[in-house]
Amino acid sequence: MALPIIDVPTFDLKVPGIKEKIKFRPFLVKENKILTLAAASEVIEDMYSACCQVIENCSFGELNSKDLAMYQIQWIFIRLRSKSIGDTQSFILSCGKCENKINYDMNLSDFEIVGDYETSEKKIELSETTGIVLKYPSAEVQIKKDQLDDIELLLNSISYIYQDEEIVTPEEETIEEMLEFVSNLPLSVLNESAEFFQNIPTLLHKVDYECTECGTKNEILINGYDHFFG
């Protein structure tokens, strides 16, 4: 006989920073395998790639992970995990003084976006008629942020350049032309962009806990790929 086709439930999510609602489905066995292999590698790039693959699969291809900022990847992944596996995740926390291990069960809905995701662009005027508009760097760029210098980060965060009514996007120019353009910008642009990058939204949950052995009060911020897998 023909193997049955299993109906999979779908649900809509209003992703922060995206106007339209996106339709998703929960993880399937194949996505769980992708995540398990990534978790076993303990390599942050593998975890990022796994999240991106799962998000693209579960959004029926509506989302391109390369267009998403890190906080959006994290936010979507947590919602997918809640719908697929459950609303809670167990962590083992350590005491900063005696290193005693403490079990902690977290409700994933306790994650909060810290930062202004509504203002996802910054306009920097170079003259009365000319300027650049920055966007939050994609997750793909942000995950390599520590490996990029200020010029490279700025280069990868330009949404478009305008002069009077004309608009030019980085995709219309060669990487060499864009690099030369950025290298010749006033130093004040780097300062303004640095302030913008400092306010990139992130997903965080602060946990205050007391050690069951020595009574020391501890605090930890749970965020990002360091804590997503487990």
List PLM regions with ranges.
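Long C-terminal interaction/binding lobes of large macromolecular proteins
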Residues: 1-230
